[in-house]
Amino acid sequence: MKTRFFILITITLSIATLTSCTNTASQPTHTVKLVGAMKNVMWKGELDGTINLDTIANKKNLYGLGPVEFLAGEILIIDGKSYQSSLVTDTSMQVEETYHIKAPFFGYANISRWQEQVLPDSIQTIQQLEAYLNAITKTLPRPFLFKLSGVVEQATIHIVNLPKGSKVSSPTEAHTGQVNYSLTDEPADIIGFFSTSHKAIFTHHDTYLHMHLITTNRKKMGHLDKVILKAPMKLYLPVNR
């Protein structure tokens, strides 16, 4: 009787272990974590930081994007390094490498493996990129982060720069003080967020994308509003494993 009981326990534990391993293996390593929501900032004026980036425990292979708390700049994490951009003048900015910042809403993921491909030459604009990503990632878990590397023929990026003490109750008010910057023939990296179900949460109401661009010399960085991508442009998608 004791022998049968021991065998039963052993089999049960073995099945539990296998189930646990299977469940762990089935979880994608690039799962996007979202903190806060764009609509709470834009419509409810919740400008305080909901996440301190320095508290993210695993910074290895980390990627992420969002605004600085109180809409005082932009944040981009790429290859485990965190960058904050802030306004200096209407024509210049400061880009600082730091994790000592907070964001009112933020999206991030640890991505250790990428699938690289060359973006078709016909994909040049944000609208074309959105349609292309939607078409080729039907089997990829969503939302997901992606990366682009290459030269941008033309681009417009912005840095939010809300005056201190401002109250916000609409997107128009949230963008008070925002400054746009134009780029021409700049080598750059773009980290983007794609989802068809996160409008007003992490993307604006008219798009599936939220992207931040940083030049390869790390001197300019901001939220990407317009772009003409120059071929060849490399697209990196997270490997689902």
Language model segments and positions:
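Bacterial N-terminal signal peptides that target proteins for export
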Residues: M1-L8
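C-terminal motif of bacterial Sec signal peptides marking the signal peptidase cleavage site
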Residues: T17-S20
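Bacterial Sec signal peptide processing site at the extreme N-terminus
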Residues: T22-V32
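N-terminal low-complexity or amphipathic/hydrophobic leaders
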Residues: E46-A103
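Contiguous hydrophobic, core-forming segments of folded domains
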Residues: Q84-F144
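Mid-length scaffold segments of soluble, non-membrane domains
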Residues: L119-V179
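Short, hydrophobic/π-rich interface segment
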Residues: P163-N217
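C-terminal structured interaction module
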Residues: H212-R241
